[in-house]
Amino acid sequence: MIRKAFVMQVNPDAHEEYQRRHNPIWPELAAVLKSHGAHNYAIYLDKARNLLFATVEIESEERWNAVASTDVCQRWWKYMTDVMPANPDNSPVSSELQEVFYLP
């Protein structure tokens, strides 16, 4: 299993809306993530800095990257553009983090 972590931003006035939209996420999005090998996906909110810290375990980079081309992911990204910064393709602006410590 490959562990990934990344940081995104949420608009300062959208903390509650961001959380509402994720509780729960669309069932079809959850199904796509799982069918593409994503496990133990969690997102944490740092309210003071408007940051989202996400962790996920994936089975392969190829399968994880393929999620982006699914219709449900494209619709989700568009749905989220009013609550967080997005790239021109509507994907969330994000920065991947380098793992520096892990205690199994």
UniProtKB/Swiss-Prot annotation:
Disulfide bond residue pairs: none
Reactions accelerated catalytically: alpha-L-rhamnose = beta-L-rhamnose
Annotated GO MF terms: L-rhamnose mutarotase activity
Active site per the UniProt annotation: H22 (proton donor)
Enzyme class: isomerase
Pathway info: Carbohydrate metabolism; L-rhamnose metabolism
Subcellular location(s) per record: Cytoplasm
Residues given in the record as substrate binding sites: Y18, Y41, W76, W77
Record keywords: Carbohydrate metabolism, Cytoplasm, Isomerase, Rhamnose metabolism
Record flagged with keyword Cell inner membrane: no
Cellular component GO terms held in the UniProt record: cytoplasm
PANTHER family in the cross-refs: L-RHAMNOSE MUTAROTASE (PTHR34389:SF2)
Primary role: Involved in the anomeric conversion of L-rhamnose.
HAMAP family for the chain: L_rham_rotase
Subunit and partners: Homodimer.
Protein family according to the UniProt entry: Belongs to the rhamnose mutarotase family.
Protein name per UniProt: L-rhamnose mutarotase
Protein's gene: rhaM
